[in-house]
Amino acid sequence: MDLGEVARAIIDGNRYMVLGTADEGGRPWVSPVYYAPSGYSDLYWVSSPDAQHSRNLAARRELSIVVFDSQAPVGEGQGVYMSAVAEQLMDADLERGIEIFSHVSVSHGARPWTLEDVQEPASLRLYRARVSEHWVLDPERRPDQRTRVRP
């Protein structure tokens, strides 16, 4: 079994990821967000800069991410676990990022997004996580044995 293929299928086949952030004191916080992948190392989402996870990222850019199918039968769950660094996008990165986010949004039957949706005076901003490491559960090494992969 190609575990990189497993990771690609999970990222391609889901629409929500869970961000694991921490504030300056190290207090953890998790948040599910709709995401738009660009390949398997750049993941985009929109959030309010006032949301707890956005405030945490402003103080500490490092985060963990998990994408999984919450409808999998008990005992058959699989996910992609990731380490990343995130930022609110500006300038050319914002222009490119909103194109990617909008394209994926439309492909999922949702509305298109524009720069006006993620700049002042709008209440949302566009964020990107740059993933440095991916892991999946190795079904040959249960229970919960994660194996690093390159999707």
Report the location of each language-model feature:
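Short beta-strand segments
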Residues: 15-49, 57, 63-69, 77-82
